Amino acid sequence: MINVLVVEDSPVVREFLIYILNSDPDITVIATAGDGEEAIDALRNHRPDVITMDIHMPKLNGVEATQLIMETQPTPIVIVSGSTDPAEVGTTFDAIDAGALAVLPRPAGIGHPDHEATARKMIEVVKLMSEVKVVRRWARMRGASPASHSVRAPLLNRVAPARIVVVGASTGGPPALEAILSSLPKHFPVPILIVQHMTTGFMEGFVQWLKNSSNLPVHIARQGELPLPGHVYMAPDEYQMKVENRGEIVLTKDEPEHGSRPSISYLFRAVARVYGHDAVAGLLTGMGRDGADELRLLKEKGAITFAQDKESSVVHGMAGEAIRLGAATMVLPLEKIAAALTNLVAERGETKLGA
């Protein structure tokens, strides 16, 4: 049985979340709290397996409560947000910076066409997060200096440096991407294209949050633009993203793949066709297998590929599947990915890689 603490200042919303969570036979809401201070007390008294956390609360808000919990009694925290306004979403992602593992929108109300899907998603994420051993796994990345070239590793021969980096992430991806992008040097010489599975409405706020710590400009990708060196392009809500022969970004309403639009597989397939061995591609933490087969395709085309290791992943789904398929040239802990990317795009014929 998964024991959950629900932290929400609105009594109506609190009862709604309790109703959804208790509808699953594997979940029990063992305690509730109306603000951050009550949450700290309930945590000490009940020791839940997972906490769902509101952001805007009296006395102690969700960001402050998350930080205190992660410093004193680390517990998997899922942020449940009632707003997709970019300014407020930025605050929501501050809770990720403080140690929360996932962000979800508040499920749609009973009778709404999206109620069942959003309620099911919340239950699914709570179950997944209950299996995560929280050890403040990204704390050591924060405040780190930009990635250096001193990472020791095997030598790989390349006839030319990479021309593009593509990355896919899902559950646990936001803090992983923040850790990587904040550690890349300011003059990173190639563009970076990213697909991050995220609930519709959160991407703009997520990009704003990344901009606060990244040394590189971060954008939501736009139709027809040519990716610039040292810029980061995030696939937008509800669009598939690919590149065409000149390297320009193309956004489509093609069908979802692996239940996702944007899909990592969709982007990776296009990059394999257009860039082939001139690409560096990787899969980070996340559930499912989106991008795993296509990472193997990229490797077969001569691209350098990587997968995040199990120890530093929140959920070792996509990356784990890629490793099982033999799709990853390298398996890397999160804290070494930025240095490896920096080395891979360096302008030299032989590139040392992080391991």
From Swiss-Prot:
GO terms for biological process: chemotaxis. Involved in chemotaxis. Part of a chemotaxis signal transduction system that modulates chemotaxis in response to various stimuli. Catalyzes the demethylation of specific methylglutamate residues introduced into the chemoreceptors (methyl-accepting chemotaxis proteins or MCP) by CheR. Also mediates the irreversible deamidation of specific glutamine residues to glutamic acid. Its EC number is 3.1.1.61, 3.5.1.44. Belongs to the CheB family. The modification 4-aspartylphosphate is found at D54. It catalyses: [protein]-L-glutamate 5-O-methyl ester + H2O = L-glutamyl-[protein] + methanol + H(+); L-glutaminyl-[protein] + H2O = L-glutamyl-[protein] + NH4(+). It is found in: Cytoplasm. Its main location: cytoplasm. Keywords: Chemotaxis, Cytoplasm, Hydrolase, Phosphoprotein. It comes from Nitrosospira multiformis (strain ATCC 25196 / NCIMB 11849 / C 71). HAMAP family: CheB_chemtxs. Gene3D superfamilies: 3.40.50.2300, Methylesterase CheB, C-terminal domain. This is Protein-glutamate methylesterase/protein-glutamine glutaminase. InterPro entries: CheB-like (IPR008248), CheB_C (IPR035909), CheY-like_superfamily (IPR011006), Sig_transdc_resp-reg_Me-estase (IPR000673), Sig_transdc_resp-reg_receiver (IPR001789). The lineage of its organism: Bacteria, Pseudomonadati, Pseudomonadota, Betaproteobacteria, Nitrosomonadales. NCBIfam families: PRK00742.1, PRK12555.1. The active site is at S170, H197, D290. It is an enzyme of class 3 (hydrolase).
